[in-house]
Amino acid sequence: MSEVKKIATRASYGAALVELGKKHENLVVLDADLAAATQTGVFKKEFPERHIDCGIAECNMMGIAAGLATTGKVPFASTFAMFAAGRAFEQVRNSIAYPKINVKIGATHGGISVGEDGATHQCCEDFALMRVIPGMVVACPSDDIEAKAMVEAAYEHVGPVYMRFGRLAVPVINDRPDYKFELGKGIVLREGKDLTIIANGLCVAPALEAAEKLAADGVDAKVINIHTIKPLDEELVVAAAKETGKVVT
């Protein structure tokens, strides 16, 4: 992909919270001593009275977020994916999802792209853990534009939402007039008839690159961005599989 602007979706998360915070006074942000890393420090600077640093106590943070939600607040609990989905799984399951509490979880540093932070922080199982929880929406944006749209959609959605954001800067690929984001609805980024490539998050840009390289070899690949893992856009996936006969994820 030629020279394009790159932005880390964790930075987009922080920026989106600030913009939403200006419109909605009931929006509050919680952190577990990682405001700088999760990029929610910008919200803390803008709205210090609506930011709660819970310290290195992710389980408690989820419980506090649940409590705030019962008072009419819309809390965004923010930490690394490893701690949000791993360490605090019981609280997310029992204190947030089971009673259908309106809490949004902003999980940054997902996947192996955390790099030098090491294996203890490289959470690859968060999607699997979160998607099996009844009532939990699970999503992962492909770029800055999608991340901001996702945060706004999460605020509007009534119920728990888990969002994974990345540490590394990724290309902006959705900067177009017809872009529309909707939770649970995949986006066809490239039409094709020979096979379908399905991706989300930071894998979407490489998927588009792969499709271009395949085209040079005479293979026409469809590329779908499945930004929402749950609820999955089954209709789009099945239709693409029937159309192309081959699916790569």
Task: Please report, for each region that a protein language model flagged, where it lies by residue.
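Thiamine diphosphate
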Residues: 1-164, 169, ...
